[in-house]
Amino acid sequence: MSNIVWHQHAIDQAARGAQKGQNPVLLWFTGLSGSGKSTLAGALERALFEHGFHTYLLDGDNVRHGLCKDLGFSIEDRDENLRRVGEVAKLMVDSGLVVLSAFISPTREERDRVRALFPQGQFVEVHVSTPLSVCESRDPKGLYAKARKGEITNFTGISSPYEVPESAELTIDTSKGDLDTQVHGLLAYLKAIDVLNPPREIAGAGI
């Protein structure tokens, strides 16, 4: 490693963001399976994309088809999964993008490890706090039913704990309110922290 040095690029993150008219950031959606992380992140990405912002959504299932296809679901593999995702997200933010990620990421240590990759204010933790009972009633993939039968081990919320964030920037319960209202709340937050620069008209809200 002593022979490996960091190569400084002529174009930096600020210049890439300025070209796109935005300040790059990572929004990290965390919560139980079925809480609505991917739905919420996808709806936010759609709203941003439709109004000219440059985004990318990293989804927990999708990365296991390529980047993390060699990993299982042991504690060690889940840690490595999020380590890789964090490094990829860092590269994407450096390219000037507004990056959204939707991962259960059940432990504070895992989430804090990713947060530590970014300067203050560039990692936004969004706790999708939908209650377990609601998530289990939705069970879009049938995973809770399998976990209850013992067919899946180490399943977050059933046989493995989920550590609630202690200092998330945002908390959203998708069982309360409608998706459009929740997305507009996220857009308003991004405007307030100067990610959306300059502000643009989004769905008549002046965001």
Swiss-Prot record:
Pathway: Sulfur metabolism; hydrogen sulfide biosynthesis; sulfite from sulfate: step 2/3
Binding site for ATP: G31, L32, S33, G34, S35, G36, K37, S38
Reaction equation(s) it catalyzes: adenosine 5'-phosphosulfate + ATP = 3'-phosphoadenylyl sulfate + ADP + H(+)
Top-level EC class: transferase
GO molecular-function terms, A-Z: adenylylsulfate kinase activity; ATP binding
Coiled coil residues, start to end: none
EC number of this enzyme: 2.7.1.25
Acyltransferase as UniProt keyword: no
Catalytic residues identified in the record: S105 (phosphoserine intermediate)
InterPro entries, sorted: APS_kinase, P-loop_NTPase
Keyword Phosphoprotein: yes
Alphabetical keyword list: ATP-binding, Kinase, Nucleotide-binding, Phosphoprotein, Transferase
Biological-process GO terms, alphabetical: hydrogen sulfide biosynthetic process; sulfate assimilation
Highest taxon in the source lineage: Bacteria
Role noted for this protein: Catalyzes the synthesis of activated sulfate.
Protein family membership: Belongs to the APS kinase family.
Protein's recorded name: Adenylyl-sulfate kinase
UniProt organism field: Shewanella frigidimarina (strain NCIMB 400)
Organism lineage: Bacteria, Pseudomonadati, Pseudomonadota, Gammaproteobacteria, Alteromonadales
